[in-house]
Swiss-Prot record:
GO BP terms, alphabetized: arginine catabolic process to glutamate; arginine catabolic process to succinate
Its EC number(s): 1.2.1.71
NCBIfam families to which the protein is assigned, alphabetical: arg_catab_astD, PRK09457.1
InterPro entries (alphabetical): Ald_DH/histidinol_DH, Ald_DH_C, Ald_DH_CS_CYS, Ald_DH_CS_GLU, Ald_DH_N, Aldehyde_DH_dom, SuccinylGlu_semiald_DH_AstD
Task performed by this protein: Catalyzes the NAD-dependent reduction of succinylglutamate semialdehyde into succinylglutamate.
Positions bound to NAD(+): G221, S222, S223, D224, T225, G226
Gene that specifies this protein: astD
PANTHER family: ALDEHYDE DEHYDROGENASE-RELATED (PTHR11699)
Name of the featured protein: N-succinylglutamate 5-semialdehyde dehydrogenase
Pathway: Amino-acid degradation; L-arginine degradation via AST pathway; L-glutamate and succinate from L-arginine: step 4/5
Family: Belongs to the aldehyde dehydrogenase family. AstD subfamily.
Single GO term (MF): succinylglutamate-semialdehyde dehydrogenase activity
Species assigned in the record: Burkholderia lata (strain ATCC 17760 / DSM 23089 / LMG 22485 / NCIMB 9086 / R18194 / 383)
Annotated SUPFAM superfamilies: ALDH-like
Amino acid sequence: MTELFIDGAWVAGSGPVFASRNPGTDEIAWQGESASAADVDRAVASARRAFAGWSALDFESRCAIVKRFAALLNERKEAIAAAIGRETGKPLWEARTEVASMAAKVGISIQAYQERTGEKRQDMADGVAVLRHRPHGVVAVFGPYNFPGHLPNGHIVPALIAGNAVVFKPSELAPGVARATVEVWKEAGLPDGVLNLVQGEKDTGIALANHRQIDGLFFTGSSDTGTLLHKQFGGRPEIVLALEMGGNNPLVIGEVEDIDAAVHHTIQSAFLSAGQRCTCARRIFVPQGAFGDRFLARLTDVTSKITADVFDADPQPFMGAVISARAAAKLVDAQSRLIEQGAKPIIAMTQRDPRLGFVNAAIVDVTGVANLPDEEHFGPLAQIVRYATFDDAIERANDTAFGLSAGLLADDAKTWEHFRRTIRAGIVNWNRPTNGASSAAPFGGTGRSGNHRPSAYYAADYCAYPMASVESTQLTLPASLSPGLHF
């Protein structure tokens, strides 16, 4: 089994065999050997050798290869979407949008690099000031399972455009998607060693993160893992560390005219991708009183009709399975703990089959929980908080160490102005789902949600460092000398 990609060739790993499974059927989706520490070392060494030639290649030539990659993605959309669905449980309709986002990332990243970095010149009295941007060198990219194509692609594409070489460690739950993506890069003509793939579980990740020859690490994943990485690199200022982590995201519901629109946006916020988006709403703030009761009744009615099925079902479901049977069981356990603390189930979550990742979209009222845990439950588990005043809702919405996304559904512009001024989050939406984001804007959050904007439009900022120069084409003695100098 040759599942590692090192120095332009598919090779076998020397670590333990592991497998990924389709969470909707429990069938093996991929199997292969993991990368040992020695394999990781070879991958990093390959990237280091390739870096000099790749970074010396002119910008237009690098972009030509990356554009070819985008074109091939579009040609292979169905095959890659099927790979995504098979390993993650994501329905095909949604997996197709992920592949489309991967291709669109190329044009956005090229534009961002030119606008936010590139080269700038300004005349001076005795020369010219030049600002250029240089790639860091070898960067490690750690990908998550929820968007195994799109999210690592959001690191890899801008890193390559800037001239870096990459060692890619995907989630052990979605290695097949990573292989399919790297195959497209190879066909696009990427030079040997510029992109290397190391498959594996925890030990592979540790070997890569600890490697002394990486110049940067770009991570998307859980807050717990990201925090450990932050501690690990605390004494290494030479490493550029970009972390995009999770959120305990609030959605505040105002007394709106169109209750169905509010319910739709709430369901999209809480249950899209089976709740496995870092920007999904975890806490739904609903006003006390008659309007809140009507909203909650309608939300319950529509949510109870949401279907979950295998990724390629016909007709297509709104939700697929969550990433694994283990993840499904953890979500049910999280619900049980909330109920023990005083939460009231409105729609209780159950796991359909202990071997599979199917859970239903669930709603629990946590208003009566005295000390609500500040935790991200990564799945379709919506927590309802009833509020008395709008300021009370904002205060409780901000009562989190995270700060990724937040949303307000309200008809009044003044209410929105107050909300956006006082809420604490990196992505703040009005009358749109919390997981709606523009690729033309930075993506990321505050607090425990991350330390940079490691994807979307600001990705260029951390893929290259600024190099300032003062230049003159001629070496001449100044017309006026400093005091004490005699020529």
